[in-house]
Regions:
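Intrinsically disordered, low-complexity regions enriched in small/polar residues
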Residues: 21-23, 55, 121, 186, ...
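Surface-exposed beta-strand edges and their flanking turn/coil or helix-capping segments
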Residues: 16-19, 67, 109, 127, ...
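Glycine-rich phosphate/diphosphate-binding loop of Rossmann-like nucleotide-binding domains
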Residues: 169-195
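Generic detector of bulky aromatic hydrophobic side chains
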Residues: 66-68, 124, 184, 190
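A glycine-rich (often HGG/GG-containing) alpha/beta subdomain
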Residues: 1-103
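Glycine/serine-rich phosphate-binding loop and adjoining beta1-alpha1 elements at the start
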Residues: 77-176
Length: 195
């Protein structure tokens, strides 16, 4: 398996947006067209990353060309910002991504569902053979186990929940009332929540 990754680790947000696939019917058609040309592959596209996992070897050139077409960027620029993983390193990268260990916020919750959705999208269209099925099912099982059996499962973690917590903390420091981070009532400056 090989993986080509364009993420927050290698490209700024404005660049990453050029590789993103929209939601809705338009996005579905774009993903299908992309994957049809990519071959046996899974496409993961989130706000922080676009990654293509392809079965076998020798796919980097083809995937870089497809990503170049998608983004409107030159092949050389795509090569400059893309991270490449092959074989066991590609598998290890997928496991880190699915578990939230390669996220902007380590342990964030959303990525597991996004990986599952990307995998099922390809599997339902017959684009996953034995290798991709085995690797993705293993990564999803591992991520689920980590989420249920480690401290990562003790709190809900995402960029949004952390931002809300920071707003709440800042309002408290300023002596202002703010909506509580759990969404119930207003929190006074002393931290007590009013119903």
């Amino acid at each position: 398996m090989e993986c080509i990754s364009i993420s927050f680790r290698s490209a700024p947000e404005e660049t990453r947006k050029r590789f993103a696939f929209p939601a809705g019917e338009t996005g579905i058609k774009e993903r299908e067209a992309f994957l049809e040309r990519a071959g046996e592959a899974v496409l993961l596209s989130t706000c922080n990353r676009t990654e293509v996992y392809a079965a076998g070897e020798g796919s980097f050139g083809r995937l870089e060309e497809l990503l170049s077409e998608k983004s409107g960027m030159a092949d050389t620029e795509v090569k400059r910002i893309a991270r490449r993983f092959a074989g066991e390193k590609a598998c290890a990268h997928l496991y880190r991504v699915a578990c939230g260990m390669d996220s902007m916020v380590v342990g964030e919750d959303e990525i597991l569902g996004q990986v599952r959705t990307a995998y099922l999208f390809s599997a339902e269209r017959g684009l996953c053979g034995y290798e991709l099925n085995a690797v993705f099912q293993g990564a999803l099982a591992c991520a689920k186990k980590i989420k249920t059996e480690t401290l990562l499962s003790k709190t809900s973690v995402s960029v949004a929940t952390l931002a809300c917590a920071e707003i709440f903390r800042f309002a408290k420091l300023c002596g202002k009332a703010a909506a509580s981070p759990d969404g119930f009532g207003a929190a006074e400056a002393d931290g007590e929540v009013e119903p």
